[in-house]
Regions:
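Surface-exposed polar/charged interaction patches
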Residues: 16-19, 78, 96
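Short, isolated positions in well-ordered beta-strands
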Residues: 28-29
Length: 102
């Protein structure tokens, strides 16, 4: 990931956008969602084409329109990639899509 793109990632996620990326031969998506009970969240999902995807990590959001910076911080700092966080692996990540930034 290039310098400055982390700011684009934050901006997109705070605006209910999503980020798709590849890391170590696997694809992932970070995106907002809503549970069956109406609770909003920001989650990291696997993004496989040939098998069922699963939620790697999910953090609840309490705003109706946007995602709190604190929630984005928690998601990006959670050590769910072989003991490392998204921010720790950022230099080895290939961003494939960012939706929601300017």
């Amino acid at each position: 990931m290039m310098f400055g793109q982390i700011e684009e990632v934050y901006q997109a996620l705070q605006r209910n956008g999503d980020v798709e990326f590849d890391w170590k031969d696997s694809s992932y998506t970070i995106e907002p969602g809503t549970d069956e009970d109406g609770k909003r969240y920001l989650a990291i999902w696997t993004a496989y084409c040939d098998k069922e995807n699963y939620c790697v990590y999910k953090e609840e959001s309490f705003l109706e329109q946007l995602i709190e910076k604190e929630v984005v911080d928690k998601v990006l700092n959670t050590k769910c990639f072989n003991g490392k966080s998204f921010l720790e692996i950022a230099n080895d990540v290939e961003l494939t899509s960012i939706m929601g930034q300017d």
